[in-house]
């Protein structure tokens, strides 16, 4: 069924629909083994779904196409995920039979309806609240292994640590008795070669022998656990669940999962860690950044997983005629969905080949898969990688790759990591020799997808300049003089001010990235942010900054703009007005304030925009007549406003007769209050892509419930202001409480902000 659907004999070579690149594709040799993503750049650009005669598979390479395959585990069956990609010899098959090898269904390759009941039954040990208990063990092992070579000045990170520690963690997580760990360690790699590799005929019997022994010994250890399943670990937990749900968790399933679990929890993390260290040390500036600021480690891990993850591809079986990326795929076809290629798709990741640890959507990577077959152990892997990086950046920040080493990889289609990573350093420069107390410092481990609050950069305060009564302009730049990130009118940044985080709109020139400017009003009722800026912040100080991000975007297709700013709301508006002028658009600006002395940026505004500006001062008695201004709708006109709530409310009332979505506003603050269980109700959230239904308590946000259930989702402000936690809605009416969506978007009911919005009824369904 997986044969090429093209009659090559009839077509000969001329005109054959299989392109030269597709015909030449061989995942076992050459470019794919060196760099899978780079080797398939031609496919992402020209032929995102192609048939490989060499492999007998359809190959899928773009992000959205790969994700759509993951999303539908009925149409695209995972049943062949563990099928041997290369047929084995009769001798190897006989060798496996000698050991009663019966590796069958696991979490990875099981179809519905059996898969999800088992996944739900066995999920609990993987949730964040349970994984916390493993952190001390991971830290202890990491410290012990680094201690062994810290004073030697040279190490092979793979042989001396990264292969061993994840395996030991995996065995502890599974609950394997200490006395059986060494034996199981010796068998693990054979499973990878047996399933995803192309061993030579003469190697197949030896590989099969090792796999058979692995299977047999795993069964022996499992039987030992059955005699006393009261201990900690996933396998004792599974045995206890089996006693309650014997039809869901069967004997054969536990045996298969015992073996598969060791490999899954071990090799993927070991390879991902080796890839990460190579990538970071090859990008020295980035390595030095995380050494200086370990709070960047969680997102550095995500970017490493995206850029150079350990899982290159998965396989699926097509159960019905379908179309992927505009290409008709017949029933029975086999798919190779190349996640490493998807992770480098420019259509989803800007400048996808760049290694950017501040990339805000790094955690969209598909290295852990997606949906109902997403890796259950993803957060254990994240924990290990974060702790590894923390230990090395703290203890051996001066470590470097040994020059001119050749990186080799175990040839296979799906899993990759260097066989060796050789590093060297001068032990005399080890920081702990001068200051042993650094060994006591600990960076918090982020269990789960990193929040955008973890993605910060250090900026220097160049100046704090008064620009109106009670308003200062703060000028920020990169300490090393590098350009700051690009931004567009309406963008804001998040600035950490002491223990607080506050959002401020950018009001400088987007074309001048040597610095940013924000303007801050001192608020008498401030929770501390503006007070800190006005009373503490000085030139020469450094701050942590995140962003820029833009949830207040200017519509480039509008024919005309009306800008209305109230007080400090001028900051995003002035950047928008500058852009309108630069692009030759028709526009007018209405700037409202209590008194001209309190109106920031007034001189620049009038100098740059002249008669386009109208000043409305309460003290001067010329308040803006909003109903008169907006009495007559004008085709092609878009209204943008930032200011106090009373201004925004008045504008909303005055534009009720305008075309929908003519008015765009940005709020200063959120009006969200703490959830009051007496006034809220519990409800269900169906996660259609993951095949799960979770409960949201009356005093719990959807965001909190998602994270407690091991579902990755971003967030930042968690006040309904920034839009980071948006999730697609498939069914059910949403009680929208955010300040992000427009009236039309709310009415369409296609998305919700999970940090604040809730279900109107008993259930909603999300595309997560």
How does the language model describe each region?
Residues 410, 418, 738-768:
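Short Fe-S-cluster ligation motifs
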């Amino acid at each position: 069924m997986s044969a090429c659907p093209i009659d090559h004999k009839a077509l000969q070579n001329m005109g054959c629909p299989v392109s030269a690149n597709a015909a030449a594709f061989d995942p076992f040799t050459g470019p794919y083994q060196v760099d899978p993503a780079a080797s398939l750049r031609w496919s992402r650009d020209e032929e995102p779904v192609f048939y490989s005669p060499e492999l007998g598979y359809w190959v899928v390479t773009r992000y959205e196409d790969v994700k759509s395959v993951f999303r539908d585990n009925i149409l695209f069956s995972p049943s062949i995920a563990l099928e041997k990609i290369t047929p084995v010899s009769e001798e190897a098959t006989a060798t496996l039979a000698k050991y009663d090898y019966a590796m069958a269904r696991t979490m990875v390759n099981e179809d519905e309806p059996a898969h999800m009941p088992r996944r739900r039954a066995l999920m609990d040990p993987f949730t964040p609240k349970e994984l916390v208990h493993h952190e001390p063990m991971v830290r202890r092992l990491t410290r012990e292994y680094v201690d062994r070579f810290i004073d030697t000045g040279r190490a092979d990170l793979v042989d001396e640590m990264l292969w061993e520690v994840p395996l030991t963690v995996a065995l502890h997580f599974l609950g394997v008795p200490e006395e059986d760990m060494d034996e199981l360690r010796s068998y693990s790699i054979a499973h990878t070669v047996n399933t995803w590799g192309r061993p030579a005929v003469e190697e197949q019997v030896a590989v099969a022998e090792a796999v058979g022994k692995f299977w047999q010994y795993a069964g022996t250890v499992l039987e030992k656990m059955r005699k006393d399943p009261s201990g900690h670990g996933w396998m004792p937990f599974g045995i206890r669940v089996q006693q309650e749900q014997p039809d869901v968790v069967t004997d054969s399933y536990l045996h298969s999962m015992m073996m598969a679990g060791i490999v899954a929890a071990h090799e993927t993390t070991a390879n991902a860690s080796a890839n990460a260290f190579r990538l970071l040390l090859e990008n020295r500036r980035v390595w030095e950044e995380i050494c200086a600021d370990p709070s960047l480690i969680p997102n550095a891990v995500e970017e490493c997983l995206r850029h150079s993850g350990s899982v290159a591809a998965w396989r699926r079986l097509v159960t019905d005629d379908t179309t992927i990326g505009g290409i008709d795929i017949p029933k029975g076809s086999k798919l190779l969905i190349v996640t490493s290629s998807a992770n480098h798709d420019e259509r989803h990741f800007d400048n996808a080949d760049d290694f950017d640890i501040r990339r805000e959507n790094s955690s969209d990577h598909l290295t852990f898969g997606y949906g109902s077959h997403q890796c259950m152990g993803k957060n254990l892997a994240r924990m290990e990688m974060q702790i590894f990086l923390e230990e090395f950046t703290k203890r051996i920040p001066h470590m470097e790759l040994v020059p001119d080493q050749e990186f080799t990889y175990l040839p296979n289609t799906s899993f990759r990591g260097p066989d060796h990573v050789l590093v060297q350093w001068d032990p005399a420069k080890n920081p702990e020799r001068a200051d042993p107390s650094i060994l006591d410092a600990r960076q918090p481990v982020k269990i789960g997808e990193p929040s955008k609050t973890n993605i910060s950069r250090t900026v220097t305060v160049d100046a704090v300049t008064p620009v109106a009564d009670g308003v200062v302009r703060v000028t920020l730049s990169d300490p090393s003089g590098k350009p700051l990130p690009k931004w567009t009118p309406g963008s804001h940044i998040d600035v950490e001010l002491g223990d607080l985080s506050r959002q401020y709109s950018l009001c400088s020139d987007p074309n001048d990235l040597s610095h940013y400017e924000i303007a801050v009003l001192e608020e008498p009722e401030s929770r501390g942010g503006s007070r800190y800026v006005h009373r503490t912040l000085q030139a020469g100080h450094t701050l942590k900054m995140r962003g820029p991000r833009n949830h207040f975007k200017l519509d480039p297709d509008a024919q005309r703009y009306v800008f209305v700013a109230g007080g400090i709301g001028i900051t995003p508006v002035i950047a928008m007005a500058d852009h309108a002028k630069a692009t030759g658009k028709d526009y007018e600006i209405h700037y409202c304030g209590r008194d001209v002395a309190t109106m920031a940026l007034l001189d620049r505004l009038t100098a740059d925009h002249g008669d386009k500006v109208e000043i409305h001062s309460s003290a001067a008695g010329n308040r803006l007549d909003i109903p008169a201004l907006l009495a007559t709708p004008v085709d092609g006109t878009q209204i943008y406003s930032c200011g106090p709530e009373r201004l925004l409310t008045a504008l909303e009332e005055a534009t009720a007769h305008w075309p929908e979505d003519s008015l765009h506003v940005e709020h200063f603050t959120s009006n969200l209050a703490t959830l009051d269980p007496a006034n809220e109700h519990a409800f269900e959230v169906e996660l259609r892509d993951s095949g799960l239904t979770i409960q949201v308590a009356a005093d719990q946000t959807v965001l909190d419930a998602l994270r407690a259930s091991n579902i990755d989702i971003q967030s930042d402000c968690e006040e309904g202001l920034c839009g980071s936690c948006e999730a697609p809605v498939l069914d059910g009416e949403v009680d929208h409480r955010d300040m992000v969506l427009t009236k039309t978007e709310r009415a369409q009911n296609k998305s919700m902000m999970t940090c604040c919005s809730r279900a109107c009824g008993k259930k909603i369904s999300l595309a997560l």
